[in-house]
């Protein structure tokens, strides 16, 4: 491509960004990726969820003369992307199994005639021989592979159907490739380059940091009560709650519903029609909370998810990062809350040991251990997370539970001696719950049957809470003074390191347990904008009415960040409206008049109810 032509395309990229997508400036890394794609060179893009990956191939698609093909793993994700592109006036379509034959033929005709600029397709459909024959005649100019980590067995979400994509390089040797992912360590990145056959690619790795997400951890004591309190504090905000089993998903959703909370279960065992209904209600703000297994989320592009809860610890940091990344995609404050119990880690380790030995098991063990270290960290959680991905950060973030409420320590020798002595006196045969009951002097038949109500240690810790003693024992496990014997129903047993503590030969500091979460943030202060909250509420109401009428999710009209900017700037003319991020020419034409009329009426005081 001639130099003058490349320069012309590059200047056109900024124009497309502003006029079509309504953004005034590129985010870090986007411009370099777009320029590289326009020059015909392969790219590997590692950019956080919500960092603007999609624009990296959508803008070149509108500047290059031909068809851009986007490989995407989920139908819901394709549909969502196409809806948003159509709302911006972009000729986009998808091919998937939910379409009738007539619909599919219509899309293929649009690709053949050049009417369609962006085609979204699943990998298994793309790799059919007859489809590749069609594609060869459609003048493809760019192939974008989204969720590219799925091609690598080192990745946390390997999908066999992605493995076949490597054959595309032989079929289309001159076609520029762009591989995109939010989560890939160095090993996974090298795998993606090798398996897709990328030629001397630009490797653009943006920071993994999502500064608008507050990373929090709450120790499990009475998990359901803690979860209910946490959800009620969110006051109707959109959220996702992840659990590790279908049964727990169903139970948690039912308990939330019984408290009058708008929640629904989502997992792979439900009928497809039910899953689609839950997803659409959530996308359209008709459902507050989805309780889900990891089957939910990869196809979700809802920008205003304000919190993500992991009710069970994930198996690796990559999954945790990707799932928490569903929150705050609009750039506004969001929260990631991890409920943690070391027993959950023990269960995951036991499940792992039941798998066949070999390299894959070793990889999974390494990743699980890293997740456990994140949960048990006593330093800034964001630092642990970012340094896992190799960023080498050193400054604490000031926006996680550790930074906001540093662990407080106390002289824990006496508590440790009571706990260790009780474990020894009950002959190291009982689990944590029973040991705590003995320490606190519980009056129950089981303790009397074993005669443990006659022990010296019985009731020695009754003045402190159940949660306090659970925390003490967990810390003794972390310190290597106690072990849980999984083979004996997680019975607590003393290690040799417990002896000097029992004798009082060494000092011992313990952390005060974290039982109550920090107060949720107020969006107005955290966002930093002095916006009119009443106007924001009116704009949301108008957006919902338009979205319902047009049968699209509300954020396809405008996302929350755009509405907040409107509520701050109060634009009442076309030029003022176009200066708001997220308002392009097409959206101004479609929706601008109604929003400007509402703002004008609000400013004039003519719309008081």
Curated annotation (Swiss-Prot):
Keyword field contains Transferase: no
Binding site for ATP: 47-54
UniProt xrefs under PROSITE patterns: HELICASE_ATP_BIND_1, HELICASE_CTER, HRDC
Motif DEAH box boundaries: 146-149
GO biological process: DNA recombination; DNA repair; DNA replication; SOS response
Positions contributing to Zn(2+) binding: 380, 397, 400, 403
Domain Helicase C-terminal residues, every copy: 223-371
Ranges of residues in domain Helicase ATP-binding: 34-202
Assigned keywords, A-Z: ATP-binding, DNA damage, DNA recombination, DNA repair, DNA-binding, Helicase, Hydrolase, Isomerase, Metal-binding, Nucleotide-binding, SOS response, Zinc
Organism superkingdom: Bacteria
Reaction(s) this enzyme catalyzes, per UniProt: Couples ATP hydrolysis with the unwinding of duplex DNA by translocating in the 3'-5' direction; ATP + H2O = ADP + phosphate + H(+)
Domain HRDC: start-end pairs: 529-609
Cofactor info, note text: Requires Mg(2+) for helicase activity.
Record GO terms (molecular function): 3'-5' DNA helicase activity; ATP binding; ATP hydrolysis activity; DNA binding; four-way junction helicase activity; metal ion binding
Annotated EC: 5.6.2.4
NCBIfam families according to UniProt: PRK11057.1, recQ, recQ_fam
Protein family according to the UniProt entry: Belongs to the helicase family. RecQ subfamily.
Function (record text): An ATP-dependent DNA helicase which unwinds DNA in a 3'-5' direction. Binds to and unwinds a wide variety of substrates including 3- and 4-way junctions (including Holliday junctions), flayed duplexes, 5'- and 3'-overhangs, blunt end duplexes and G-quadruplex DNA. Involved in the RecF recombination pathway.
Name this polypeptide is given: ATP-dependent DNA helicase RecQ
Annotated source species: Salmonella typhimurium (strain LT2 / SGSC1412 / ATCC 700720)
The encoding gene: recQ
């Amino acid at each position: 491509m001639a130099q003058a032509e490349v320069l012309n395309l590059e200047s056109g990229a900024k124009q497309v960004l502003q006029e079509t997508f309504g953004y005034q400036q590129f985010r870090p890394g986007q411009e370099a990726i777009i320029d590289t794609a326009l020059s015909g060179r392969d790219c590997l893009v590692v950019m956080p969820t919500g960092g603007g990956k999609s624009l990296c191939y959508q803008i070149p698609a509108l500047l290059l003369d031909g068809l851009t093909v986007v490989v995407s793993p989920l139908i819901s994700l394709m549909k969502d992307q196409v809806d948003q592109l159509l709302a911006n006036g972009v000729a986009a379509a998808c091919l998937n199994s939910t379409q009738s034959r007539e619909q599919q033929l219509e899309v293929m005709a649009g690709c053949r005639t050049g009417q369609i600029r962006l085609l979204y397709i699943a990998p298994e459909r793309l790799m059919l021989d007859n489809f590749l024959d069609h594609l060869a005649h459609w003048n493809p100019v760019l192939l974008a592979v989204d969720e590219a980590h799925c091609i690598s067995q080192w990745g946390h979400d390997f999908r066999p159907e992605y493995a076949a994509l490597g054959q595309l390089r032989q079929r289309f040797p001159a076609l520029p490739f762009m591989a995109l992912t939010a989560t890939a360590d160095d090993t996974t990145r090298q795998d993606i380059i090798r398996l897709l056959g990328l030629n001397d690619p630009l490797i653009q790795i943006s920071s993994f940091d999502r500064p608008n997400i507050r990373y929090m951890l709450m120790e499990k004591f009475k998990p359901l009560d803690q979860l209910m309190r946490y959800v009620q504090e969110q006051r109707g905000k959109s959220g996702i709650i992840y659990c590790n089993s279908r049964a727990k998903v169903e139970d948690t959703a039912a308990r939330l519903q019984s408290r009058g909370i708008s929640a629904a279960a989502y997992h792979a065992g439900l009928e497809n029609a039910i899953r689609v209904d839950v997803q659409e209600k959530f996308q359209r703000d008709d459902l507050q909370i989805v309780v889900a297994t990891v089957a939910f989320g990869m196809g979700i592009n809802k920008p205003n998810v304000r919190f993500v809860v992991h009710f069970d610890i994930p198996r690796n940091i990559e999954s945790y990062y990707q799932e928490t990344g569903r929150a705050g995609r609009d750039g506004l404050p969001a929260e990631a809350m991890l409920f943690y119990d070391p027993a959950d880690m023990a269960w995951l380790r036991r499940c792992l040991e039941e798998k066949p030995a070999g390299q894959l098991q070793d990889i999974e063990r390494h990743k699980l251990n890293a997740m456990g270290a994140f949960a048990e960290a006593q330093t800034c959680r964001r630092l642990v997370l970012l340094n896992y991905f190799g960023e080498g950060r050193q400054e604490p973030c000031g926006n996680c539970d550790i930074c906001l409420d540093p662990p407080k320590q106390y002289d824990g020798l006496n508590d440790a001696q009571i706990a260790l002595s009780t474990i020894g006196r009950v002959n190291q045969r009982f689990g944590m719950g029973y040991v705590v009951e003995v320490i606190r002097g519980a009056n129950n038949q089981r303790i009397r049957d074993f005669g443990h109500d006659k022990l010296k240690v019985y009731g020695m810790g009754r003045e402190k809470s159940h949660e306090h003693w659970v925390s003490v024992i967990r810390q003794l496990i972390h310190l290597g003074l106690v072990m849980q014997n999984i083979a004996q129903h997680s019975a607590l047993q003393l290690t040799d390191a417990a002896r000097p503590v029992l004798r009082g030969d060494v000092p011992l500091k313990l952390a005060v347990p974290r039982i109550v979460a920090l107060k949720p943030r107020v969006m107005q202060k955290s966002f930093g904008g002095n916006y009119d909250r009443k106007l924001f509420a009116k704009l949301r109401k108008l957006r919902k009415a338009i979205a319902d009428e047009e049968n699209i999710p509300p954020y396809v009209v405008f996302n929350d960040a755009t509405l907040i900017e409107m509520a701050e700037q109060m634009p009442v003319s076309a030029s003022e409206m176009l200066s708001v991020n997220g308002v392009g020419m097409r959206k101004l034409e479609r929706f601008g008049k109604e929003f400007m009329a509402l703002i004008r009426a609000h400013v004039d005081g003519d719309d008081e109810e």
